[in-house]
Amino acid sequence: IPGSQGSLDVLTERDIKFVEFAAHNDIDYLGLSFVREASDVVKLRELLHSHGNTTARIISKIEKPQAVNNIDAIIEVSDGIMVARGDLGIEISNEKVPIVQKTIIRKANTKRKVVIVATQMLDSMIENPIPTRAETSDVANAILDGTDAIMLSGETAAGAYPVEAVAMMKKIADNVEESPFMRKNKFPRKMIEEEKDSQAMAIGMSIADMARKMNVKAVIALTGSGFTASMLAEGKLNIPIFACCPSKNICRDIKLYRGVFPYIVDFDASIDKESLKQMDEFLMKSMKLEDGDLVLVTGSVPELLVGGTNFIKIHEIGKLKRQENAQK
């Protein structure tokens, strides 16, 4: 019933069995439906931990008015947020959904949490090969709001044009990201205010400034926990963030962040000469960068510390090797 508080447990017996299966099968993300308060998320995390899984991430689906009222606390304990507009529109009325969507995206961005906008994005493409103009604008505005991901549901699950729907969504996203209206190389103001004394935030803002002013092709984030890459993602950089991670779990964790392309690396994540030469080979082979390209390298030294981002290096790919060859 729309607007009702409801007293049912957020996890049914069937859900608990699914969670047990997920915990033992290396699942990256679980979506928790009909979250009402932070304790619902905590309960799911404790259940995962009871099965020995401490790596699966939780996406809280915001579908109830109670969740909207408790959004700050829910964001704090979640790994990501999904604005599930279908049920949310029934619960709080359609005209309120756009402002709620913008508010949630902004709050999630500020806290460096993945945010997904979903439901009825290209709904008419369930039956038609092209979307309505209103749907196109809806997808575009979600991207302009700052969402990390846009999601199809019925369009691909049961629609007559699933491939066309995905292609259309990508076409809209590409067009929006090239537009002058897209926030680029700029962190959310509230995030800057809340982290004004953060060393990592200062480095992130410097990288955003360099990305805007210099002809750099990418940021190389040497990250042990995913922190550096997730922080940079909120700056909406106009260049890709190639995250070099020590494990597949970290890579998979951060893949949902906007503009982040994670890779498992087998070289030392440091900035000594030999490591940089290894990195150059990797960048040209795996990331399609070229000899002579400028990139920004960031991370923490002397070792990969969680949240310890403490350096930026302007690096020219191939320069070290060329210098060595010239000295022979």
Model-derived regions: residue spans:
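Non-catalytic helical/linker scaffolds that mediate oligomerization, partner binding
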Residues: 1-328
